[in-house]
Amino acid sequence: MSVEGKGFWIWKVKDCEGGDPAKIVAAAQAAGFSHVMVKIADGQYAYNLDRNSNTDLLAPVVDALKTAGIAVWGWHYVYGYSPTSEAAIAVKRTTELGLDGYVIDAEIEYTQPGRVTAARTFMDRVRTGLPNLPMALSSYRIPSYHPQLPWKEFLDKVDYNMPQVYWEKAHNPEPQLRRTVKEFEAKTPFRPVIPTGPAYRAGSWGPSTDDTQVFCDTAKKLGLKAVNFFSCDECKRDLPKIWD
């Protein structure tokens, strides 16, 4: 399954259109999104569940989006402390929700010593459980700043690279994205880059509408087939002009 067009991430589904499946679909269609990433797990635990009613908040949202022809990927923040348990919940959630793809969000915890073995164990088990599913890695935008992260172990087993190209405290998306792509083109293995741009506030900073347009335009100039934005929860609340 190829990924093309624009996509957005959902972190806490209740904070995106109140978790209403019909409203989420309408918002995605109005914005022209072709795909959506929903958070399915955090570490070894399922995410976006209502613990009081033991209800899966994602199931109706996923079904509604897929019915509308919008691809749905699950994303999973991983820590590496228990890679076998994290792999098990990844396979379980992805399978039970009938997702179109799976994204591994590996960040600071995976820059700690000894994480190469954890990454290899995790990826082997996830790939065994989901042998034909498209997968992506989502991590730092500048790999040379984070050499400790086991890039190869993750990239060996995924189909796409979705770096987090967040130009916080600045307004320079073009050079940031160009550097991201250049650095990943020099890494082995190379995977098609689908960058994620910021659609949130960090203190007093937030991306401008011009930033967002330049980001998308630069992606096209570089021949990238898709871009993503993080996240629906925060963008519609804090940066409505960006969403529009």
Give the residues covered by each predicted segment.
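Boundary/entry segment of secreted carbohydrate-active catalytic domains
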Residues: M1-S34, K39-A41, H76-G80, N132, ...
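Extracellular glycoside hydrolase catalytic/binding regions
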Residues: T111-V116, L133-K182, S204-D217
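Structural preference for beta-strand elements that scaffold enzyme active sites
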Residues: V3-W9, S34-M37, G69-W73, D100-V103, ...
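Substrate-binding cleft of secreted/luminal carbohydrate-active enzymes
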Residues: Y166-A170, E183, P189-D244
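Active-site groove signature of glycoside hydrolases
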Residues: S34-A46, I89-A118, A226-F229
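Aromatic-lined carbohydrate-recognition surfaces of secreted/lumenal glycan-active proteins
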Residues: F8-V13, I70-P83, A119-L149, F190-G203
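Aromatic-lined substrate-binding rim segments of carbohydrate-active enzymes
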Residues: V38, D42-H76, P113-L137
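Short, acidic/polar
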Residues: V13-A30, S82-E96, P143-F154, L177, ...
